[in-house]
Amino acid sequence: LPRAIHFDEEVMRIFQMVNLSEQISKISRIGTKGMHFVDNEDNILMVRKGSDAIGELGWQKSWYFHQPQLEKLLRDNAEKEKNFISFLGYETQKINHDSDLVSVKSYSKSLKKELVLNCKYLVGCDGANSNTSDYIGKEIKDYGLKEKFLVLDLKVDNRYNNIKNLPDFTVQHCDKVRPVTRCYISKKRRRWEVKILPSDNENEFLKSEAIWNFLGKWIEKKSAKIERSQLYTFRSIIKKKWYKNRVILAGDSAHLSPPFLGQGMCAGIRDVAALAWRLKGYANNKLSADDLVNYQAERFPHVSAFIQLAAEVGKIM
């Protein structure tokens, strides 16, 4: 299912480092027109400009994509590597460690099968509800934003005029009661992010009829198909500890950002890029365990700055 929809030039540079930038550029769209902030009457308040110009890192600054396509591309390429093994559908249940190894016990409900793996280091990239993160500790730094949004991903049919007339850029409706973000992902896909109010009946709001009544301001039901409708609680938090007993966190396991800057997945990929060379150096006896600990010292200030900025952008909405 689609989740993230945006990455930046630094992430494309990381994709280039693993020889995937050319493939990924073919399934992505450059964000040339930025984000338009409008009032309740669609008057433009501000434009955060986009561009197709190549930036300092050798790539355009903003890219939009369909996450299932990107995940398939990454997985297909990873499976070509001799040292890559995947076990899909397993959930971590217990983590143990000694001075030399980490042991991970997982279970697949669909296969009704237990799996135990032993490793030198375990990297927990298991998302916002991370069991690995809980193992390391629950202390967080909270920057205060906690808001519910309904995220709607639609596949649209461009044969209809109401779809053709949609803007080819992202629009932020700065409504003080119910902010709405309309994202232009590609010619075939659009996203709406709608704030849920305390007075809303969430079960009613999630019904198909209610969703289409809301979307009717912009599109007709016959011209689009809802691929996903999901309630999210947007948070602005970062774990205080990312490392314990040979277990390391990366991505949403370590931090959660509101999506208002499109930097959530970017932060996770930066984490992995900062961690990968350290793990390789350690495995080749060129780095010490202290160099792995320094991973958090490198990433924490950068991630926390972006989370705080995203929370501030949320206030503008």
Feature names for model-found ranges:
Residues 36, 76, 121-234:
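Conserved FAD-binding catalytic core of PHBH/FMO-like flavoproteins
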Residues 2-79, 173-174, 183-185, 307:
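Active-site-adjacent segment of FAD-dependent monooxygenases/related oxidoreductases
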Residues 78-92:
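A conserved beta-strand/loop element that lines the FAD pocket in flavoprotein oxidoreductases
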Residues 74, 124, 226, 232-313:
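Conserved mid-domain beta->alpha element of the FAD-binding
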Residues 111-121, 125, 244-246:
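Core beta-strand elements of the Rossmann-like FAD/NAD(P) dinucleotide-binding domain
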Residues 35, 84-85, 247:
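Short, conserved active-site loop motifs that form the nucleotide-linked donor/cofactor pocket
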Residues 88-103, 230-232:
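A conserved short coil-to-beta-strand element within the FAD-binding core of flavoproteins
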Residues 39-42, 50-57, 72, 76-81, ...:
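Helical substrate-recognition/capping region of FAD-dependent monooxygenase/halogenase enzymes
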